A protein has these predicted regions:
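Bacterial Sec-dependent N-terminal signal peptides
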Residues: 1-17
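A cross-kingdom marker for long, charged
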Residues: 22, 206-258
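Acidic/His-rich structured neighborhood in mature extracellular/periplasmic domains
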Residues: 77-188
Length: 258
């Protein structure tokens, strides 16, 4: 852990995330736009003002993330939203202005119910609301991935909370939470990530970011060498140990331009 990323100090804030939420409702005609505006404002407030963990982040250390939600269907009578979402999180690179993509995935079943001016509540031990479950899941996943990139397996506790939330969401009548539903749903992502066979993939997060990208400012040659080694060792072993997991392919897809 570096001196620029300290969790406990007197000047730190509680909030971990700095999320921008975009609601694209161009496909929905004849509906008062205010419901979408209220949804966007409610969600940004919920994600950004909540303390998700007991960790302390400096304001400039908060994890920048984006939720781009596209509404494909809206039923005003039942307050049901049918959506897809692109979720992305970024990580700063030490001693540079560069940011690297930490996480990027499309959730094709980002469906929920929301009535205008709803006050949304979240209790991770009692998951009874799809909307808060979705954002709780991605909040814990993003924070856990971020911690893994600063210390080997550093996000274990937070990622276990993500897994617990997923298990507690099994009774929700929405797609995406069930085991074996498909290989890229929310259950599959967190279950695979915590699987013992994916430890090399988790080690990759640390080796790629902390010993690779973060080292580039001090020694570009050493940084590039460490990145190459991480890809050749960690990524290759993760694929060999758990060939059916989609995680290495998802990671490679959003890293290919880097």
């Amino acid at each position: 852990m570096t001196s620029w990323f300290l969790f406990f100090n007197n000047h730190a804030t509680a909030q971990e995330l700095q999320a921008k939420i975009t609601i694209n409702h161009n496909q929905i005609q004849g509906t008062d736009k205010s419901v979408f505006e209220n949804l966007q404002q409610t969600l940004e407030q919920f994600v950004n003002e909540r303390q998700w963990t007991n960790l302390k982040f400096q304001k400039n250390e908060r994890i920048v993330c984006n939720f781009n939600i596209t509404v494909t269907k809206y039923d005003q009578s039942s307050n049901a939203f049918t959506c897809t979402a692109l979720i992305q999180a970024n990580r700063p690179v030490y001693n540079s202005a560069y940011t690297s993509t930490l996480f990027n995935i499309k959730d094709a079943d980002f469906n929920f119910e929301f009535a205008q001016f709803d006050q949304i509540e979240f209790n991770e031990e009692n998951i009874d609301n799809q909307l808060t479950a979705l954002f709780g899941y991605y909040a814990y996943l993003i924070i856990g991935l971020n911690l893994d990139s600063f210390a080997p397996m550093g996000g274990e506790d937070i990622l276990q909370r993500c897994m617990n939330l997923t298990n507690n969401a099994q009774n929700l009548s929405f797609t995406g939470w069930k085991a074996f539903e498909n290989s890229k749903n929310r259950f599959a992502i967190i279950n695979d990530y915590l699987d013992g066979g994916m430890k090399p993939f988790r080690q990759l997060q640390y080796d790629y970011y902390r010993t690779g990208l973060d080292e580039m400012a001090n020694s570009p040659e050493r940084g590039r060498t460490n990145i190459t080694t991480a890809l050749q060792n960690d990524l290759k072993k993760a694929h060999e140990d758990k060939p059916m997991s989609m995680l290495p392919q998802i990671w490679t897809d959003y890293k290919k331009d880097e």
